[in-house]
Every structure is written in C-alpha cells, then in structure tokens.
C-alpha cells in the first residue's frame, strides 16, 4: 500500500472513530463520491464464504448474469459495467473492511451487498462517509436505511424490511391458515429475527401460547421442541436464518410435530431443505420477494431461462433480488457523472420493472413492492400467493 493510500485510509478510520464518539454532526458532509470513468465500476461486498455463504453465492450469480446481459446489450451510455468483488466471509467487521477497500482503493461507483442485515449495518457507514451508494438486495433490518437524523442518503435496499415481514406472517397465519394459536420461537442473537418477532407480536390477532428463543449456532433444540409438542396450538412461527431453522424443522418433524412452520425470507434457500431433509421440509411457509411459481413481471420467464442456462439450477429469491439490484444501478447510472449522481437517481427511481416485480423507491429508500408467501412440501416450492399488507 502506498504512503498516500495509507494516509487516506488512516484519515477515513479516524473520521469513523469521531462519528462513533458523536464528534461529527453530519457524516455525509464531505461525501464527494467517486467519478465514473471509462467503465461503471460496481463493487460486490458479499458473503461468499462463512455461515451464510448460500445467500452470497446466489446473489453473486444474479449479479454476474445481470452484468453480462447489460454489457452484451452495449452497457450504459456506451460504458460497460465492471465488477470488483470482495468476500466479507459472513462477518460484519469484514463487511466494513470490504466496503472501505471498494470505495477508497478500488474507487467503485456503487456497491451491491452485503446480503445480511448485520453486515449491511457495518458497511453502511462507509457508504455514508465516502458517497458511494450501497444497495443491499436482501438486508431487511428496519433501520438500515434510516437513522436518528432521517434517511441515509447513500443506503438503499431492493427487498422489504423486517417489520413488513412480521406483518405478513401475522396476517397470513391468522387469516389464511386460520392459526388462532401459535408458538413463537426465534433467534434471540439476531437483530433480523428479533425485529420480525417484535412486529409479529404487535400485529398478530390470535394467542401466542408460548414464546421461546434460540441462538445462532445452536445445534440441539430438543428441550424446547419437547415442551412445544404437548401444547395446544395451530402453527409455529420461527423468525431466523436457514442455518438454524432448517435444523429445528428436522428435529421438530422427528419428534412428531407436524404443525405448519412459518418463517421469514431467511428460509428462502435450498440449504433449508438440505438441513431439514426433503420429507421434513413440508407444510412450511415463508415470506419471499420472488418465486418461480409466480410471474411478478413479464421479465420473470426470461430471467429463469437465462439463469438455468448459466447455472443449471432455478434461481432463488436472493439471486433474483441481486439481479434486479444491478439493473436498478444501471438505470440510475444513466447520465450520471459520479457515484453521488447514482445515489440521487436511485432515490428517484419510480415504476422500475424487475423480475421481483414493479417497484418505486420511497422516501426512506425502501421499495414499494409485493410480498409473497411461499409453501414448501417435500422440499419443493409448491405454491406462492401475494399478501397485501399496509406498510
């Protein structure tokens, strides 16, 4: 690393420290961004290894497919898209470091990722400080795009937020499944899961028979599940990631618990079925922003065909959201000279049609779009239906 770059990086981290200590009134005050050169440089800050690599790898596939398509069609304003990829290893601290490297050393014009909320939260301050917009395909934590001062100028998302998922789970379980009594079992070590659980508790009209928690990394859930088995309830609502919920589903079915299991978009990966087992992954419902069973736009069938040709498998929600994210950045890059221009254009994006549906970015940088409830039987998605909820 050259002396000049070293000084820039040291100054950047010093400013981060001052912000953390409350010394800076506005972290975006000097966020001048990066200039767009001969190519439009898109940084990819993604969980390619580690605990939730399944999300990151699917999103990387969607990103690459979109970039290839756009470049083959001539790029944006005659400029090709160039990817610079960093593996954040499913670690929040590494996500921050990756964004710093992408923004300061690689001088990217926009960043796609990370995939998970904790990693996005860690990386978002870098975007706020440098003026390089971050668009997370799947980070759902409510406060990722806002803080005490209002909307974060350089942070956006393609998916819906946690509180919306909690509302969808509450409405669908009560109205569609007629589940008037539920067990609420969630990951207390995850802000993502806690946020969904909190909103579910606020919105659910039925009775929560019992509320229990587990922690990320746990492997044995027999004690809690044994207690649930003899209770009177209609469904289990289980906010968390597939890494734990897939195992819990297997252990629940092995104990003879056959009640419907409902969860958030953290269930939306084939790894869930691998962990649960195909037979056990039945009567399972989860929130999703995309399903191959429902065409949310005219672009859906073409995307599925192209994805299967490229990767020999169907795309999941994470791949679709990441694919849309690249096209959103491409749209926002039209006539842009800097990364700040891209951020400004993303904030004004209206009626954008992607494979996950038509969306408009609202004042808090969240998309206004449809949500789905997907049903899984024998490890396969068998149905998907739209759920209308007031945001």
What are these regions (language model features)?
Residues 310-319, 330-381:
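Segments of small-molecule ligand-sensing domains
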Residues 30-62, 86-93, 115-116, 185-194, ...:
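Extracytoplasmic "Venus flytrap"
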Residues 249-323, 377, 387-389:
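Extracellular/periplasmic periplasmic-binding protein-like sensory domains
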Residues 48, 152-213, 235:
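An alpha-beta-alpha
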Residues 26-31, 55-58, 73-146, 214-218, ...:
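Beta-alpha junction/loop-to-helix N-cap segments that form part of ligand/metal-binding clefts
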Residues 127, 196-287:
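Extracellular/periplasmic bilobed ligand-binding domains
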